[in-house]
């Protein structure tokens, strides 16, 4: 194995924060933000071509997905294709992927004047990341955030990912 995985998929999910999760000092320590669903944390993830999580990061629930995308991509290591939804359609992200030698399989937003073509057959595999979120949210500790500190909640998510995907 060369260490380069073929495809990677990226996405984020909202997790509702229980009322007991509030109270840690500082917004960064909490990673809890107000969104339409109330107080939430957002878990950002990048999965490999087998649907196994490679990188998981937290942010406040009101942060948009693309603001964490560069950090996920940098932490992931080399890959050939990145599959993402329309929320990740930005020129700066496409440039970052081109610099890394990766193909962007991202549909264009409707506001883009000249839509950029993408591999629609490869895009069908993007559901790997959605299936990963469903599997991780089977763990009660991941589905609802009860921890005050972001680092404690992230540890719970990483432990659930390890149990679900890496221990066999």
Please provide the spans of the model-predicted regions.
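Short alpha-helical elements
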Residues: 1-168
């Amino acid at each position: 194995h060369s260490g380069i995985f073929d495809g990677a998929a990226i996405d984020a999910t909202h997790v509702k924060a229980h009322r007991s999760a509030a109270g840690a000092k500082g917004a960064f320590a909490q990673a809890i933000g107000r969104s339409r669903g109330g107080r939430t944390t957002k878990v950002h993830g990048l999965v490999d071509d087998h649907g196994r999580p490679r990188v998981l990061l937290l942010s406040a629930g009101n942060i948009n997905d693309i603001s964490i995308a560069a950090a996920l991509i940098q932490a992931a290591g080399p890959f050939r294709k990145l599959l993402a939804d329309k929320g990740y359609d930005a020129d700066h992200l496409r440039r970052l992927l081109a610099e890394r030698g990766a193909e962007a399989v991202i549909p264009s937003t409707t506001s883009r004047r000249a839509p950029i073509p993408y591999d629609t057959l490869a895009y069908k595999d993007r559901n790997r990341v959605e299936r990963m979120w469903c599997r991780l949210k089977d763990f009660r500790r991941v589905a609802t955030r009860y921890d005050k500190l972001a680092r404690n909640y992230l540890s719970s998510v990483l432990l659930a990912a390890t149990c679900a995907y890496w221990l066999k």
